[in-house]
From Swiss-Prot:
It is found in: Cytoplasm. Keywords: ATP-binding, Cytoplasm, Magnesium, Metal-binding, Nucleotide-binding, One-carbon metabolism, Potassium, Transferase. Belongs to the AdoMet synthase family. It catalyses: L-methionine + ATP + H2O = S-adenosyl-L-methionine + phosphate + diphosphate. GO terms for biological process: one-carbon metabolic process; S-adenosylmethionine biosynthetic process. It comes from Xanthomonas campestris pv. campestris (strain B100). NCBIfam families: metK. InterPro entries: ADOMET_SYNTHASE_CS (IPR022631), S-AdoMet_synt_C (IPR022630), S-AdoMet_synt_central (IPR022629), S-AdoMet_synt_N (IPR022628), S-AdoMet_synthetase (IPR002133), S-AdoMet_synthetase_sfam (IPR022636). Homotetramer; dimer of dimers. This is S-adenosylmethionine synthase. GO terms for molecular function: ATP binding; magnesium ion binding; methionine adenosyltransferase activity.
Length: 403
């Protein structure tokens, strides 16, 4: 019997890097609401008393970038200098310029189907049947812990009103013969008001954050709990650490369980395959696993700048495939259009929804129907996390001739 440990981590929406991600995606959403043809590459840095928003944008839209940035910060919960950052009074510096015409000529085409990739690169998508979300268990639980921290913190008349926005989680699982069997260790660090006793904090976190999330069947006498192990976490957010867009790419994806092509997501419109192709690869892998073609599936795609067709598509099922990986690859090529325009159409990616993805993981979330208002004031229906649908699983299973 083989036995090993595996660890993943997550961070809350109040973590400095996640503040930056959310601002970048809020800018993208605001522009897409007015201009579906926009090209956006938005980067944000937050540090004590200031948010710097930079990047390259080509659009006919106008947005109030300062007001938008302040709203994101305030909605997270940074509304006072006492907390360490105040969206009302912080400086907002706008350093956004235009996208290079050299890139435009490589991406734009008269025939939309021949739209070229916005850059070269390689992207991975992954799925496993070890959780209902088709995500690796360690990252799934890590996300849910910090999500629960935010839920409790924002709850009206919360008994844990002393919680502050910045938080981190980490979960270590024990695997026996490739199957998760127990939680070996949990780390939960949460920012808090001064004056909170360590004993009270530990008890509250156990009852209100850990207990509702962690599966009881995986907890045992030997499970180690590290709750605010430094003993104090008052200074947090952008005061404690500088935050930058795109610095939490492993948190955003599979927690280190699957490979990563290196490209970040937030602030990038769907013409950037760093984002759209990673979403598509997840969609493909999840449908392969949901179809029962494999227990685990990793899909890699790659592109050349200005070229529509992927330069490669490869599939690995780690010995769990019910049919050969080569046959799964052929089915993928037949059932999924992985050209940039094909991905955008397949997943309906050109509308505001991206700020929703910027915290608690881009994958393993439930598709959500919502409405948004465009630049003319008209209302539109849309779906976020469309890449989490398993609507092609049945067709894949039938094509594979599995009973």
């Amino acid at each position: 019997m083989s036995s090993y440990l595996f660890t993943s981590e997550s961070v809350s929406e109040g973590h400095p890097d996640k503040i930056a991600d959310q601002i970048s995606d809020a800018v993208l959403d605001a522009i897409l609401a007015q201009d579906k043809r926009a090209r956006v590459a938005c980067e944000t840095m937050v540090k004590t008393g200031v948010a710097i928003v930079a990047g390259e944008v080509t659009t006919s839209a106008w947005i109030d970038l300062e007001a938008l940035t302040r709203k994101v910060i305030l909605d997270i919960g940074y509304n006072s200098s006492d907390v360490g950052f105040d969206g009302e009074t912080c400086g907002v510096l706008n350093l956004i310029g235009k996208q290079s015409p050299d890139i435009n000529q490589g991406v734009d085409r008269k025939n939309p189907e021949q739209q070229g990739a916005g850059d070269q690169g390689l992207m991975f998508g992954y799925a496993t049947n070890e959780t209902d979300s088709y995500m690796p268990a360690a990252i799934h639980l890590s996300h849910r812990l910090v999500e629960q921290q935010a839920k409790i913190r924002k709850k009206k008349n919360s008994a844990l009103s002393w919680l502050r926005p910045d938080a981190k989680s980490q979960v270590t699982l024990r695997y026996e013969d490739g199957v998760a069997t127990a939680i070996d260790a949990v780390v939960l660090s949460t920012q808090h008001d001064p004056g909170v006793k360590q004993k009270d904090l530990i008890e509250a976190v156990r009852e209100e954050i850990l207990k509702p999330v962690l599966p009881a069947k995986w907890l045992h006498k030997g499970t180690k709990f590290h709750i605010n192990p430094t003993g104090k976490f008052v200074i947090g957010g952008p005061v404690g650490d500088c935050g930058l867009t795109g610095r939490k790419i492993i948190v955003d994806t599979y927690g280190g369980w699957a490979r990563h092509g290196g490209g970040a997501f937030s602030g990038k419109d769907p013409s950037k395959v760093d984002r759209s192709a990673a979403y598509a690869a997840r969609y493909v892998a999840k449908n392969v696993v949901a179809a029962g073609l494999a227990d685990r599936c990793e899909v890699q795609v790659s592109y050349a700048i200005g070229v529509a067709e992927p330069t490669s598509i490869s599939v690995t099922t780690f010995g769990t495939g019910k049919i050969a990986d080569e046959l799964i690859e052929k089915l993928i090529r037949k059932h999924f259009d992985l050209r940039p325009f094909g991905i955008i159409q397949m997943l309906d990616l050109i509308h505001p929804m991206y700020q929703q993805t910027a915290s608690y993981g881009h994958f393993g979330r439930k598709p959500k129907d919502f409405t948004y208002t465009d630049g003319t004031g008209a209302q539109h229906s849309a779906t976020s996390f469309s890449w989490e649908k398993t609507d092609r699983a049945e067709a894949l299973r039938a094509a594979a001739k599995l009973k």
